[in-house]
């Protein structure tokens, strides 16, 4: 099958060097997986740097960098103004040798893909990766309105939408996307990199809780810090965010630091700053528990990566976490915003090493069996075949 992946940003090295939470890692890894399954894969991304070549190949995948506007990173508003050019360039490249299916990542790429395939009969499959609905609090009113309208348009026009979770499926149907046009295909995890066997970061005598730095306004870390006050034998490591030198000037992290000070736990809360992709599993293996209680997220890759490392997860009973974490088997689910309940569940887990070990073993097994890239790649191809 000739597969075209369309995205705003990706490079041939994204699978190993990009922001671990960015869409570039996911697109590059999916492309490599599809190529390993025997498909002809080309990734199309807007050229965002003068140093970027016209095309390059890596791991059996061809990456083409399409000129559309200035060869620089663009804000959402400026990018929208270049989508017509991006779409026209794609249409010209596909005129003589169209792909069997186009898979767009993020809503802006969906608009470009729909324009490029208009009247050709080539099906477009859409992965949003993130929807604007749970992020409205961090967008301007105008941005939220535009994004909501465009996501609805893309979702209702493409042949198939691949939702990351049951939570995203519900959001999509709320936008008016027909249920029959949606297939749940979660993000995959690299089970070679994220594995229980491997080095772990050094730690002291305290029990370690690991959480991710905020990716949105509704991150739930206030609840975790409040719960820490009732867990005197534990420490909280918040991994990721801006470079270490910028932690003291980051407004979100400083709000959390002030909350930790008021709660009397500032000596037990650590901010790592930006973490390389290779360092993430090292930190995950060092933790007794990975805590992720942002209940609105439609994509649950962070708990999945923790599970793959054999680390049990305490997650929110809402959002994508409910798909990933099997309550009582690979971790526990708690109601978002309840610090007392969170502290109680964490205390119970930390008091039972055998239970914690059993949860970790089951978590790693579930990550390997359900979320390996090989399985996710095959599920994605099945969706392509239904669309084509």
Give, region by region, the residue ranges found by the protein language model.
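Short alpha-helical donor nucleotide-sugar binding micro-motif in glycosyltransferases
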Residues: 274, 282-287
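A short, well-ordered alpha-helix in the C-terminal region of glycosyltransferases
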Residues: 348, 355-370
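Short hydrophobic beta-strand element within catalytic cores of glycosyltransferases
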Residues: 312-316, 325
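Conserved donor-binding/catalytic core segment of Leloir-type glycosyltransferases
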Residues: 201-219, 225-231, 237
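Carbohydrate-associated surface elements
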Residues: 167, 188
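Conserved acidic donor-binding segment of nucleotide-sugar-dependent glycosyltransferases
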Residues: 327-328, 332-339, 348-353
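Aromatic "clamp/platform" in nucleotide-sugar-dependent glycosyltransferases that forms part
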Residues: 295
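N-terminal subdomain of nucleotide-sugar transferases
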Residues: 1-56, 61
């Amino acid at each position: 099958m000739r597969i075209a992946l369309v995205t705003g940003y990706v490079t041939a090295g994204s699978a190993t060097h990009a922001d671990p939470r960015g869409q570039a890692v996911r697109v590059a890894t999916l492309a490599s997986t599809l190529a390993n399954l025997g498909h002809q894969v080309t990734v199309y991304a807007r050229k965002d740097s003068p140093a970027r070549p016209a095309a390059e190949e890596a791991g059996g995948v061809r990456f083409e960098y399409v000129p559309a506007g200035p060869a620089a990173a663009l804000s959402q508003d400026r990018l929208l103004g270049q989508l017509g050019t991006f779409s026209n360039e794609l249409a010209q490249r596909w005129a003589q040798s169209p792909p069997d299916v186009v898979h767009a990542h993020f809503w802006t790429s969906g608009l470009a893909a729909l324009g490029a395939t208009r009247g050709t009969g080539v099906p477009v499959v859409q992965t949003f990766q993130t929807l604007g609905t749970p992020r409205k609090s961090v967008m301007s009113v105008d941005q939220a309105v535009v994004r909501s309208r465009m996501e609805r348009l893309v979702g209702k026009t493409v042949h198939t939408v691949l939702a990351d979770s049951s939570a995203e499926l519900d959001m999509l149907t709320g936008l008016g996307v027909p249920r029959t046009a949606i297939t749940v295909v979660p993000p995959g995890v690299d089970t070679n990199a994220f594995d229980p066997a491997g080095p772990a970061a050094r730690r002291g005598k305290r029990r370690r809780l690991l959480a991710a730095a905020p990716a949105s306004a509704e991150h739930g870390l206030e609840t975790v810090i409040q719960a820490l006050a009732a867990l005197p034998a534990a420490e909280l490591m918040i991994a990721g965010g801006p470079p270490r030198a910028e932690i003291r000037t980051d407004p979100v992290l400083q709000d959390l630091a002030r909350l930790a000070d008021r709660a009397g736990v500032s000596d037990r809360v650590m901010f790592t700053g930006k973490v390389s992709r290779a360092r993430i599993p090292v930190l995950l293996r060092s933790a007794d528990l990975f805590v992720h209680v942002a209940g609105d997220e439609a994509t649950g890759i962070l708990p999945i990566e923790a599970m793959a490392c054999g680390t049990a997860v305490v997650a929110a009973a809402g959002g994508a976490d409910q798909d990933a974490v099997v309550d009582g088997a690979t971790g526990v689910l708690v109601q978002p915003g309840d610090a007392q309940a969170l502290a109680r569940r964490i205390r119970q887990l930390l008091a039972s090493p055998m239970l914690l070990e059993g949860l970790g073993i089951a978590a790693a097994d579930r990550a390997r069996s359900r979320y390996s890239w090989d399985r996710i790649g095959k599920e994605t191809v099945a969706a392509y075949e239904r669309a084509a």
